[in-house]
Amino acid sequence: MFAVFWTNLRCLGYNTFTCGVETPTTWGKVGSLDASSSTFTTYRGYPLAMAISAGTPACDSPDDNIRRAINTLRADLSALLRGESVAYSAFLSACTKFDGFAQSCHGMLSDDTLDLLYSFSESLLALSENMALLETKKEAESNKFTAEVMAILSDKTSGLDLSDDKNEPTSPTPAYVEPCARWLKDNWYNPYPSGEVRTQIARQTRTSRKDIDAWFIDARRRIGWNEVRRKHFENKRVDIVRAASIFTGPQSIPAEVDALPDHIELEFAGILSRARSLYEEKFSPSKLAVKLDTAVKDMTPSLKEQLKNDEARRKREASTVGIINQRARHAYPTPERSPASAAELLASPPSFAIDSDKLPSVGRKRRRSLESDETVSSPLCKRPRSQSVFCELSPVKGLPSPSPSTQDELLETSAAPSPQPSLLPKLTPTDSARSTGKRKRRLSDGFQYPAAKRPEIRPQVVSDPFPATSSEHWEQWFREHVLSSPELTLTGDIPPAVTTDAPDSNTPLDIQLFNFPLIPDLPPSVPVVPAPTAELNIIEPLEVPAVTQVNVDPEATALDHTFSWMASDFPPPLQSTNTFPSSSPFSALDGMSLPFPDTRSSAFLPDPSLWSNISDPDLDFSTVFSQPSTNSAMTSSIQVPLQPTWLTSRSLSEQEREAKRKELEELEARAQAIRAEISAP
């Protein structure tokens, strides 16, 4: 009875009773069995058998031992089924020994003990059979479940991409373009891919077959294949493919086949070029990419480590150099050289000393402020770097203000106006330093000119962009352009004040006129006569005929006070071309102090049209001017003052000229009326 149970129990194995239980290596032995003897010792503290060989009864009867063993095994089996910590191997070994012990003492057991033993064995048998069946079905269902899950996963994950699309850059061109363009570049002579090729490209790029077919149709058109096929091969696919194959491999052409014409070869060369550019323009790596790829491939781990060490070493060297330069920059300055000897003091300063006359005025003030700051500061303090650099640039420490005597001379020179410029004495650095009274202490002359550490000819930035002109240049320019002029006679003395006396009406006038050109834009019909102003400040010369004379009352025509200065023997007038009249009033003072134009010009001759309506007897002015009347064509011109030329230099517009002409006509009419009144008896 127990044999079937133990056999089924062994067939179930470890997994039947140990699901979720610790491994057997961690279990301790629940019972112990002495293998050297056939006597069971204990199982969980209970004796299992007695010595059979001697037949001596044990301490307890076999019934008691069997009952206690069955109870213990039933409890351990329940614990084993619940997954508690029970040693499966120890339980199985105990059951085997218990089976042998029960068979050995079968005849000594009572009926109650046998009934208990049979019931326990039946329950174990049913349990073992069900457990064995369960294990078989479990294994079958597990295998079936695994197969179904793998089938589902393989079906659902076939279209999935395990790569992270978010990290990959999205390309503007579809994925199928690159393999199609690569195939077309390699097979341009027969751009008709088979169905297998197009299906493979569609499967690799997860694209529909329709898109692949459409791309190849458009590509043949773009490379010019269709045009050449229609133009030279009567739209026959076989002929153009054969000709393209001949163009691709001329060495494989049979002898009886003629070579392709030149224009056909030229067409195929264009197709080949366009097919290659279709791929290389977008997908072929550039020269820089190839070079970088080669450099990355050649970059071994040891080379990377070496480059990293070199970079760290360069950084350390750069930091060290920076620290050294900083320390040198803040170091205490070197002492200046010792005082020079007497011979060096008497010698001229070196060539790099800056002349005080060459420096701009703004620069002098700035350098003097730097010097004053340096002298006030304590000698124990370090000199600022800006001042030390300035000392290297210029050996002259500063240019102080001129001495009081020089300032007095300047004040006197500026107060007294003189045509000649005042020459200022040049101030040397030594004299200027001696003239200052603010400096407390000064180094010797040997310290004034340290060795120049920079080039002598070096541009310096100053506040005044225009350098000051020296007095020598100004004096030379004054001598060349002013003193050398023959019109000027400068004596160097201050001229006396100019006084103007009241004019004497009895004093004859000496009038000289400038030679200005005539107005070229006057029409020939208009007489060239200066237009008198509204105040009649210009009196035209009257041409008096000497043929007829009219007796005029001396009292009515007495011009003693006005024309007493007009003598008969006038000097010959000068020739003048001034014809610029002016409308401004003319005073007697201006006529006496300013030169006037020549009255011999045609501008001072009367208009003949004004005398056409007057008879000859009416125009005899011999009695007025106390001159004999003659029949000759000689005329007597009266010299009258005109306006100065600087008042008539402005050109007139057309409106102004028209107004002047109208004004001139009115004045001429008025003058004609006055002449008629004068000539009346």
UniProtKB/Swiss-Prot annotation:
Biased composition (Low complexity): 413-430
Keyword Iron-sulfur listed: no
Bias type Basic and acidic residues, positions: 307-318
Gene3D superfamilies tied to this protein: Homeodomain-like
The entry's keywords: DNA-binding, Homeobox, Nucleus, Transcription, Transcription regulation
Top-level taxon in the UniProt lineage: Eukaryota
Any one GO BP annotation for this protein: regulation of DNA-templated transcription
GO molecular function terms noted in the UniProt entry: DNA binding
Chain residues forming the annotated DNA-binding region: 165-227
GO cellular component term of the entry, any: nucleus
SMART domains per record: HOX (SM00389)
Record localization: Nucleus
Recorded family membership: Belongs to the TALE/M-ATYP homeobox family.
Assembly information from the UniProt record: May dimerize.
Role: Has a major regulatory role in sexual and asexual development. It may bind DNA itself or it may have a role in preventing DNA-binding of another protein.
Domain text: The C-terminal domain has a high percentage of Ser, Pro and Thr residues.
Name used for this protein in its record: Mating-type protein beta1-1
